Amino acid sequence: MQRIAGITKMVTHRRWLGLLLLLLCVGYSHGMPHVLRFGGIFESIESGPSGAEELAFKFALNTINRNRTLLPNTTLTYDIQRINIHDSFEASRKACDQLSLGVAAIFGPSHSSSANAVQSICNALGVPHIQTKWKHQVSDNRDSFYVNLYPDFSSLSRAILDLVHFFKWKTVTVVYDDSTGLIRLQELIKAPSRYNIRLKIRQLPADTKDAKPLLKEMKRGKEFHVIFDCGHEMAAGILKQALAMGMMTEYYHYIFTTLDLFALDVEPYRYSGVNMTGFRILNTENSQVSSIIEKWSMERLQAPPKPDSGLLDGFMTTDAALMYDAVHVVAVAVQQSPQITVSSLQCNRHKPWRFGNRFMTLIKEAHWDGLTGRINFNRTNGLRTDFDLDVISLKEEGLEKIGTWDPASGLNMTENQKGKTANVTDSLSNRSLVVSTILEEPYVMFKKSDKPLYGNDRFEGYCVDLLRELAAILGFGYELRLVEDGRYGAQDESSGQWNGMVRELMDHKADLAVAPLAITYVREKVIDFSKPFMTLGISILYRKPNGTNPGVFSFLNPLSPDIWMYILLAYLGVSCVLFVIARFSPYEWYNPHPCNPDSDVVENNFTLLNSFWFGVGALMQQGSELMPKALSTRIVGGIWWFFTLIIISSYTANLAAFLTVERMESPIDSADDLAKQTKIEYGVVEDGSTMTFFKKTKISTYDKMWEFMSSRRHSVMVKSIEEGIERVLTSDYAFLMESTTIEFVTQRNCNLTQIGGLIDSKAYGVGTPMGSPYRDKITIAILQLQEEGKLHMMKEKWWRGNGCPEEENKEASALGVQNIGGIFIVLAAGLVLSVFVAVGEFLYKSKQNAQLEKRSFCSAMVDELRVSLKCQRRLKHKPQPPVMVKTDEVINMHTFNDRRLPGKETMA
């Protein structure tokens, strides 16, 4: 009985135990799984240490299991398999092994061939495949069991293109590591067809890490804007080799597509001046992210990075951060799937996981704020969307954030412009720059000294002072060098090659060109210019014409010959009009005998001769005894008086100047005069900006001048300004040059003068190589000098000379015969003419008397001459006819001027 009772008791205990197990199973079936396995497949070198992705995979799982915040009732385990790089068969076999164990998801591998093999298996069996490396997505992709946390490279390519636009690059070199780089940068490669960008594509050597031959070609080709598409290890090697080849200077600007640029050791390049830009997806500014990275650095000590990787200790790479976020995203999906169970799957049975579709949907719908920012997926293709990138750039303090980029709003540069301006002095301090210049007064000249001078002390001038002021503001040192070929810089039409200072800037033989270097369109295409420090134009330098003394008839010069002719015509016209009006107006006829009011005879004083005499008297401002009585004749007289008043006043005002000033008559007065003649030769400095202006001009006058100069190129072109000035002084030659230099020369040589005004308008600026970081800094310093008035002070210092005596400063000299001798000639001519007229009148009157007295002409002339020679006699007998004439036969001698009053009868 006891045995039976014991058996019964044991059975009862087993029933209770079974019931308890049943309840536990029921409870387990309605809650989250207690243990869930993830699979990880990672590439590694045989017997090598664990990679960063594998460590991040373990680190993420351990973090979730320790915190118990995300999955409080579930423990995550893992199965890690290692494969050789690019071994897709081994990757497939390892994936099948993990699926047979039962995994909820497979992470990795990284390389595309192995990843594609694993992806096809996961897609067939309905198991999520999680990737953290870039993979090329075809347009008809049907891999529904797939998500990728790496940003889509079409977006990254647009981000790089936005940077190129922001930096205003016109020439870009793309250097890629493998063929997938061309796919990743397709947006940038398409840019030349849509934007004005010249693109050159190069490939890194495939079988070696020696990039020096490629870098040498780039240096020879002056390729300063380069985009490197490679991993962080190759990027670190390229930077070291570029430093050894002298390609880590301020003229080079590199953009790296790797998101691990922030983790590279850039300490050797901080003070090199090189421009280095990249992107960072790791949100290091978040305190929680920083805390996780700090914990990661402790884990990383177990497997530090390889010495040749170029990575800094304690930095979490982008691949590791993406793997960490990938594990957490899948854990979020596990949290949302309470009844998920894993099962063993066989690759040869093609029986998919029954929870696969649901679990994959939960993963694509999951949201997580991870180390790499907000994580969302496109539910169609499984690609990541809505990610943010930090734009980082190398500064003297290291790599700093200068902006952000996201697919929605694009590039947003957030660099502190105020701080950037404040650091202008710091960025150039203690740097030594090579400055190219050219000898030209008063810009750069050799300093006159009894002692031998060396270095920068050999030079003086406006540009030397300007350079000294710029160096004082920006804190840099400099070495002043004369340009080797002595030219400013022009492009050869046949070869397209440049010379002079422009060439030295293009070849980076000089950092600055501080000289009278004009800012032109063609130069701006190959070099950069600062803001102008001087504005000017082209004008004509010519000999000052010799002064000519006024001639004896210079009193006629105040009025032009046309005006003299018009005055004569006006005088004749007014006199005739006055005569006609006076004849027609009844008020100009008057009684010649006022004492006899009954006289029927009236007289008109304005005969034709009297009308001419009236005009002469008014013109000479002497008047006459003739006065108009009618209103009409008074109007004519008043208008004529007003006319003569203005004419005489204008004549008098100009007469003094024309009699006292020596006339400076130049054969040319403007560029038009030069273009219309060929007697006076004219030219410019060869290969200068003035020559470029005439060569490129579309204005007909200047184009005609260029045809003349180009046809006589060897005879009219000069090598320097000094040669041009010498030709002006020694021959009949006009020199076209900058107005500021003409101003300087004419202040010191009174035999030279400027002809006409400015032909064009241009400016001088400080030249820098294309893309030089010094340009903006130089511009700011020039604007500061302008606001302080120092540019004007320097110009006054170097342009002010003794000056030439001004004409108006001369004392008035006494007038000589050569000034007003013509007046005496006119007077003498008038006297001689009056004598001849008097003789004519005497002869004419003698003839009339002879006819009246019925005697000979000679006797009448002798009598008249006898009376005329008796100077004291005032009276003489009036000639009488020999016979008496009847009263009614008396002829009125004024029949032409007298007329009888109307209504009166004629005399009987």
Swiss-Prot record:
InterPro entries: ANF_lig-bd_rcpt, Glu/Gly-bd, Iono_Glu_rcpt_met, Ionotropic_Glu_rcpt, Iontro_rcpt_C, Peripla_BP_I. It is found in: Cell membrane; Postsynaptic cell membrane. It holds the Pfam family Lig_chan-Glu_bd. Glycans are attached at residues 67, 73, 275, 378, 412, 423, 430, 546, 751. L-glutamate binds at residues 516, 518, 523, 689-690, 738. Residues 32-561, 660-819 are extracellular. One of its GO terms (cellular component) is kainate selective glutamate receptor complex. Residues 583-638, 841-908 are cytoplasmic. Cold receptor activity activated by temperatures between 10-19 degrees Celsius. Disulfide bonds join 96-347, 750-804. It is a multi-pass membrane protein. It catalyses: Ca(2+)(in) = Ca(2+)(out); Na(+)(in) = Na(+)(out). Keywords: Cell membrane, Disulfide bond, Glycoprotein, Ion channel, Ion transport, Ligand-gated ion channel, Membrane, Postsynaptic cell membrane, Receptor, Signal, Synapse, Transmembrane, Transmembrane helix, Transport. GO terms for biological process: modulation of chemical synaptic transmission; synaptic transmission, glutamatergic. The chain crosses the membrane at residues 562-582, 639-659, 820-840. GO terms for molecular function: glutamate-gated calcium ion channel activity; kainate selective glutamate receptor activity; transmitter-gated monoatomic ion channel activity involved in regulation of postsynaptic membrane potential. Residues 1-31 form the signal peptide. Homotetramer and heterotetramer with GRIK5. Tetramers may be formed by the dimerization of dimers. Belongs to the glutamate-gated ion channel (TC 1.A.10.1) family. GRIK2 subfamily. Ionotropic glutamate receptor that functions as a cation-permeable ligand-gated ion channel, gated by L-glutamate and the glutamatergic agonist kainic acid. L-glutamate acts as an excitatory neurotransmitter at many synapses in the central nervous system. Binding of the excitatory neurotransmitter L-glutamate induces a conformation change, leading to the opening of the cation channel, and thereby converts the chemical signal to an electrical impulse. The receptor then desensitizes rapidly and enters a transient inactive state, characterized by the presence of bound agonist. Independent of its ionotropic glutamate receptor activity, acts as a thermoreceptor conferring sensitivity to cold temperatures. Functions in dorsal root ganglion neurons. This is Glutamate receptor ionotropic, kainate 2. It comes from Danio rerio.
